[in-house]
C-alpha cells in the first residue's frame, strides 16, 4: 500500500501539472478558449507597459506571454508525467513563475480576485515541494517488528524521558 506521503505527492503533481498544462496552452493558442486567450494578450500588454525595463531590453508582450506559457506547458507536462527529480525542478520553476506573475499583478494594481488563483496554486506548489523533500518515514510498528533477518522481535520499547 502506498504511503500517505506518496499519495499526496502524486495527487498534487497530477493536479498541478494538468492545471499548468491548461494555463500554458491558453497563453499559447486560442483553440481552448478565445476569450481567455484574448484576456491573456491584454494582460501581458499591461504588464510590459507597467515595467518599461522589459521593453528597453527588447522583451515584447508577445514574447513574455509565449515564454511564460511555454514554460508552464513544459513544466506541467514534467510534473504530470516524468518521475523523480525533474518533478522537483519543474515545481521550482513553476513556483518562480507564479511569483513573477504575482509581481506583475501587483504592479498593474489588479484586484485580488484577478490573481487569487495564482496565490492558491503558489501555495500548493510550495506544499508539494515541501512534502516531496521530506524523507520517507518508517512507521514505528514496522521498525519494531523487524529483528535480525526480518524475524519478529518482542523487545519492549525503551524511551528516554528527560
Swiss-Prot record:
The biological process GO terms on file are: chaperone-mediated protein complex assembly; positive regulation of protein localization to cell surface
| Record topological domains on the Lumenal side | 27-61, 110-114
Which InterPro entries would you find in this protein's record? Answer: TMEM35A/B (IPR040399)
Region (Disordered) residue ranges read: 141-162
Residues on the membrane's Cytoplasmic side span: 1-5, 83-88, 132-162
- Membrane topology value: Multi-pass membrane protein
Question: What GO cellular component entries does it have?
Answer: cytoplasmic vesicle; endoplasmic reticulum; endoplasmic reticulum membrane; peroxisomal membrane
Q: Where in the cell is it found?
A: Peroxisome membrane; Cytoplasmic vesicle; Endoplasmic reticulum membrane
Respond yes or no to whether keyword Chaperone is given for this record. yes
Name the domain of life this protein comes from. Eukaryota
Q: Ranges of Basic and acidic residues compositional bias?
A: 152-162
Membrane-crossing residue ranges in chain numbering: 6-26, 62-82, 89-109, 115-131
Keywords assigned by UniProt?
Chaperone, Cytoplasmic vesicle, Endoplasmic reticulum, Membrane, Peroxisome, Transmembrane, Transmembrane helix
Does the keyword Membrane belong to this entry?
Answer: yes
Free-text function comment from the UniProt entry:
Molecular chaperone which mediates the proper assembly and functional expression of the nicotinic acetylcholine receptors (nAChRs) throughout the brain. Essential for the proper folding, assembly, function and surface trafficking of alpha-7 (CHRNA7), alpha-4-beta-2, alpha-3-beta-2 and alpha-3-beta-4 receptors.
Stated family: Belongs to the DoxX family.
Report the protein name in the record: Novel acetylcholine receptor chaperone
Task: State the organism named in the record.
Answer: Xenopus tropicalis (Western clawed frog)
The encoding gene: tmem35a
